[in-house]
């Protein structure tokens, strides 16, 4: 028998550099999602937290961190790390637990705080790690790395600068309707280029 899974509510903290702990952002989003769904925290049976590596141990165990901040309730917890995909991994883990019959109500929470400037790899010397190599050997920050990938896509598949600009235009359009979006200004392909 197939069991349906649905997202009943959503919440979001406004994007930006607000100078507070990532837990505050996650708790606000979680409470907003619960209110949007009409579900009380005590009814949540499972919490999947999207991990962040830039916030010390609480970031590594984000599921437990968010559950504790919301008020321990006995809900099971999981922490999921997948860099920029940690949130989607947390959704996948929560879905799997619902489908397995481990819970009926799950809460997925993801939040992060980042330093200003470029993201340097996590400390330590790891000469077999491509992320470490690109940063330390050739100075390729994330911006450079993604620019190189974009150029490769242009060479392999014929993508154009206008194609990439169209993505920014589309994203800006969506931001206009979202009061929590970081960028809320309409743009055109010409503006971007």
Regions found by a protein language model. Name each.
Residues 1-76, 99-100, 110-193:
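Conserved "HGTGT" condensation-loop signature of ketosynthase/thiolase-family condensing enzymes
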Residues 67-93:
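Aromatic/His-enriched, Gly/Pro-containing loop or helix-boundary segments
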Residues 90-98, 104-106:
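Thiamine diphosphate
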């Amino acid at each position: 028998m197939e069991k349906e899974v649905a997202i009943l509510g959503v919440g979001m903290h406004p994007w930006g550099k607000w100078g507070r702990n990532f837990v505050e952002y996650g708790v606000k989003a979680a409470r907003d999602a619960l209110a949007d769904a009409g579900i009380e925290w005590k009814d949540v049976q499972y919490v999947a937290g999207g991990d962040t590596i830039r916030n010390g141990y609480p970031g590594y165990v984000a599921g437990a961190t968010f559950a504790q901040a919301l008020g321990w309730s006995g809900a099971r917890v999981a922490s999921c790390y997948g860099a920029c995909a940690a949130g989607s991994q947390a959704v996948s883990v929560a879905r799997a637990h619902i489908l397995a019959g481990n819970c009926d109500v799950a809460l997925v929470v993801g939040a992060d705080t980042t330093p200003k400037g470029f993201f340097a790899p996590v400390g330590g010397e790891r000469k077999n790690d491509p992320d470490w190599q690109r940063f330390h050997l050739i100075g390729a920050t994330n911006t450079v790395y993604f620019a190189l990938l974009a150029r490769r896509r242009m060479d392999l598949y014929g993508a154009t600068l206008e194609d990439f600009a169209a993505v920014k235009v589309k994203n800006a359009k969506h931001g206009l309707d979202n009061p929590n979006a970081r960028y809320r200004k309409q743009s055109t392909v010409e503006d971007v280029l």
